[in-house]
Amino acid sequence: MVVAVYPGTFDPLTRGHEDLVRRASSIFDTLVVGVADSRNKKPFFTLEERLDIAHEVLGHYPNVQVMSFKGLLKDFVRSNNARVIVRGLRAVSDFEYEFQMAGMNRYLLPDVETMFMTPSDQYQFISGTIVREIAQLGGDVSKFVFPSVEQWLKEKVAALDPANGASAAQP
């Protein structure tokens, strides 16, 4: 049985993420979606919210497990007996960082492979950062996220600044 881990912050989980999960889950016996704590990134959604979103969107895949992790990816990979780390590459700009991470992971986990997957054409430009910015500015994100995620975004934006629906960090 081949287990793969697809780690990420998933802040929020987008249609691009789901596209990779759908495709990777057809390759591996088990795909573990690892939602990283990533406190140093100061995520828009809490870890618990990101887990809830991932369960909502990915819960129908029978061989996909969603769980959180803190600390080193290598420890999470080992604890799940994974043989592969799945990473998405949207553009050349992603490659340099992902290549360095794959090299470090190979050093730390010599028996684990990193598999890069490119998104389907319609999702190549989607990123959680861009989706959050559009949502915070009142734009339509329905083409980039699932309806439940769009609702989570609207509620979070409204909670941050109920007066105008924009981020509380904006003046």
Curated annotation (Swiss-Prot):
* Any single Pfam family the record assigns to this protein: CTP_transf_like
> Which BP terms from GO are recorded?
coenzyme A biosynthetic process
Per the UniProt entry, the signal peptide is: none
Source taxon at top rank: Bacteria
Cellular component (GO) terms are: cytoplasm
Entry keyword set: ATP-binding, Coenzyme A biosynthesis, Cytoplasm, Magnesium, Nucleotide-binding, Nucleotidyltransferase, Transferase
Q: Which InterPro entries match?
A: Cyt_trans-like, PPAT, Rossmann-like_a/b/a_fold
This protein's assembly is summarised as: Homohexamer.
Q: Name the family.
A: Belongs to the bacterial CoaD family.
What is the protein's name according to its record?
Answer: Phosphopantetheine adenylyltransferase
From what organism does this protein derive?
Paraburkholderia xenovorans (strain LB400)
